[in-house]
A protein has these predicted regions:
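Preference for protein termini
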Residues: 1-199
Length: 199
């Protein structure tokens, strides 16, 4: 017999951020600004995506643009194929964060999820041209992924994707570079010329 009530057992299936750091410059992941999150998935280590009923369907319905993520298969739909075959929450968190940033108007591009020596604890690294925006996208991605897992067994699980994207768009509009400055910065970065916002 289990030692916890149904609700307690489900609440143990969580994604917790132990630490979030903004690495503003060359780092162990890349030469560009990066957000590095230390993430504890606890019991979710035992729940790859293919073992969660309805997860793939909800995720691909809520974020259909994930079809463009190539992932390790190096082909359109590669990431969603990984989700169907079974991948872990931090890998999914990485891709969902990048896609939410992209849909909000701040392209990301780089992402990695790597195990640490502690079971269930991962490092997730993401392109972070603006730390506050990427951090907000990471938190929204966590909420979306947990809602798609539906461990509360809701008869109609949902997540306000449009609301999350609109919130991130507001942050991009108020904190990120305007279109002309962004083009200049993009060109500088393409030529390995560092750029830092001075506000």
């Amino acid at each position: 017999m289990s030692n916890c009530s149904n609700q307690d057992c489900h609440s143990a299936k969580d994604i917790k951020f132990l630490e979030i750091k903004h690495l503003n410059g060359p780092n162990i992941w890349t030469y560009r600004p990066t957000l590095e999150a230390t993430v504890d998935i606890g019991e979710l280590e035992d729940y790859p995506s293919d073992k969660i009923p309805g997860f793939y369907e909800r995720l691909s319905q809520w974020l259909p643009s994930l079809i463009e993520h190539r992932c390790s298969y190096e082909e359109r739909g590669g990431f969603l194929r990984r989700v169907q075959e079974g991948t872990w929450p931090c890998h999914i968190l990485e891709h969902v964060t990048l896609e939410l940033q992209n849909l909000a108007g701040m392209k990301g591009g780089f992402g990695r999820a790597r195990e640490t020596s502690v079971r269930g604890v991962y490092k997730v690294a993401l392109s972070a041209w603006h730390a506050e925006i990427t951090t907000a996208a990471l938190h929204s991605a966590r909420e979306l992924v947990l809602a798609a897992m539906n461990f509360q067994q809701s008869s109609n699980p949902s997540y306000d994707v449009e609301g999350a994207i609109n919130h991130l768009r507001d942050l991009v509009d108020s904190l990120w570079l305007g279109p002309s400055t962004a083009c200049i910065v993009d060109a500088a970065i393409a030529h390995n010329i560092p750029a830092t916002r001075l506000i």
